Amino acid sequence: MEELTAFVSKSFDQKVKEKKEAITYREVLESGPLRGAKEPGCVEPGRDDRSSPAVRAAGGGGGAGGGGGGGGGGGGGAGGGGAGGGAGGGRSPVRELDMGAAERSREPGSPRLTEVSPELKDRKDDAKGMEDEGQTKIKQRRSRTNFTLEQLNELERLFDETHYPDAFMREELSQRLGLSEARVQVWFQNRRAKCRKQENQLHKGVLIGAASQFEACRVAPYVNVGALRMPFQQDSHCNVTPLSFQVQAQLQLDSAVAHAHHHLHPHLAAHAPYMMFPAPPFGLPLATLAADSASAASVVAAAAAAKTTSKNSSIADLRLKAKKHAAALGL
């Protein structure tokens, strides 16, 4: 017990010495508010959380010394406790302001009210970037160029001369028409695409029309040839024998295939041998052969006339379409 009392008294003596070395409340009042703001050791001893460790130790020692003064050995502690109590008794507004300034200057790592967290900064930067992207997308919208009639005429005239004008021609035309070279280049690209599309449509239309004329010739040898007769031949050849009818059908198919082979698309030449029938057998009467050849000639003539009429009509249709297109363009 005596050892414990000696240890406590020794610790109290050390704390009293530290307190004497610290700045007292009276010295702070005499020195003014500036000294209290500059020196961190001038804070109030009675505060627990916001005071320095040395001052907290001095205040605690004074309180403990005041409580154990009856045990003998805490006289200095009692005096320190009284000083601490007197120091913590009265507070002035100036003192509180000085303590707030000292705390802000003493704790540089504490968060300030003016500082912004990094997450909030990142969010603001992301929102700003999204707004900038939206503005750039709106600005990148292309505006359609409205060409005048004179500009279209000049462009069409140069397109008739060449479909691929060089840079010098485009620059000269752009200066003459008051357009940019990029606009002229884009117009020629669109015009070439439109021209290719029209050519493909016309080519497909001609092929479909020509193939529909000779659709009856594209049959296999085992198909019933009786169904391939022309309507105008049914009444005139009712009294023909079955053998002569077979010969006539063979001649008709041979002539039609030969005509299609020479005038239709070249890729049908490979299929022509499969369309032909074997030659008529020998030993038939000459009158029958002559009648069959005459009927075959009439069939060939009718097919040629139908082809010529269809060709003329297709050319007329193309010319009419060209006139309509020119009228639509305002040429």
Curated annotation (Swiss-Prot):
BP GO terms, sorted: cardiac atrium morphogenesis; cardiac pacemaker cell differentiation; cardiac right atrium morphogenesis; cartilage development involved in endochondral bone morphogenesis; chondrocyte development; chondrocyte differentiation; embryonic digestive tract morphogenesis; embryonic forelimb morphogenesis
Example of a GO cellular component annotation carried by this entry: nucleus
SMART domains referenced in this protein's UniProt entry, alphabetically: HOX
One Gene Ontology MF term: DNA-binding transcription repressor activity, RNA polymerase II-specific
Motif OAR per UniProt: ranges: 313-326
Entry annotated with the keyword Acetylation: no
Pfam families associated with the record: Homeodomain, OAR
Tissue specificity comment: Highly expressed in striated muscle followed by liver, kidney, testis, brain, heart, lung and spleen.
Cross-referenced Gene3D superfamilies: Homeodomain-like
Chain positions covered by the region annotation Disordered: 1-20, 26-140
Protein location: Nucleus
Keyword annotations: Developmental protein, DNA-binding, Homeobox, Nucleus
Role summary: May be a growth regulator and have a role in specifying neural systems involved in processing somatosensory information, as well as in face and body structure formation. May also have a role in heart development.
Name the record gives this protein: Short stature homeobox protein 2
Main location: nucleus
DNA-binding interval(s): 140-199
UniProt cross-references to InterPro entries, sorted A to Z: HD, Homeobox_CS, Homeodomain-like_sf, HTH_motif, OAR_dom, Paired_homeobox_Bicoid
Organism annotation: Mus musculus (Mouse)
Record-linked SUPFAM superfamilies: Homeodomain-like
Sequence ranges of Basic and acidic residues compositional bias: 93-109, 118-136
Segments of skewed composition (Gly residues): 58-91
Protein family (similarity comment): Belongs to the paired homeobox family. Bicoid subfamily.
